[in-house]
């Protein structure tokens, strides 16, 4: 469950602008704020089942966006390469403060 929650949070970060206002709200409450389905249903005055169905459809939409656009996959690949590069430079004592700062800036561009 923890892995799924992390994945949904990352997908939400990348693709939230493609979601409706309602989808954003439900997913935000559920995954980011850790509300239960019942708490969200009470907040929006709808059934627990309506919240569940909407969140499931939104999860499917987020996965479809990722399948087509691949933003999370590319981000994870870049992070892995930056980590490898940093380790290689550190190992060879090439990692001075200026290079370290540049690597950090590259990581933070997205």
Curated annotation (Swiss-Prot):
Might take part in the signal recognition particle (SRP) pathway. This is inferred from the conservation of its genetic proximity to ftsY/ffh. May be a regulatory protein. It comes from Listeria monocytogenes serovar 1/2a (strain ATCC BAA-679 / EGD-e). NCBIfam families: PRK00118.1-4, PRK00118.1-5, PRK00118.1-6, YlxM. Belongs to the UPF0122 family. Disulfide bonds: none annotated. Gene3D superfamilies: Winged helix-like DNA-binding domain superfamily/Winged helix DNA-binding domain. This is UPF0122 protein lmo1802.
């Amino acid at each position: 469950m923890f892995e799924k929650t992390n994945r949904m949070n990352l997908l939400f970060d990348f693709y939230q602008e493609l979601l409706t206002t309602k989808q954003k709200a439900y997913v935000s409450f559920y995954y980011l704020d850790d509300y239960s389905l019942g708490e969200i249903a009470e907040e929006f005055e709808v059934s627990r089942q309506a919240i569940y169905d909407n969140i499931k459809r939104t999860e499917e939409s987020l996965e479809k966006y990722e399948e087509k656009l691949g933003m999370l996959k590319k981000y994870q690949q870049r992070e892995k390469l930056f980590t490898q590069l940093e380790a290689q430079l550190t190992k060879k004592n090439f990692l001075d403060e200026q290079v370290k700062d540049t690597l950090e800036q590259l990581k933070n561009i997205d």
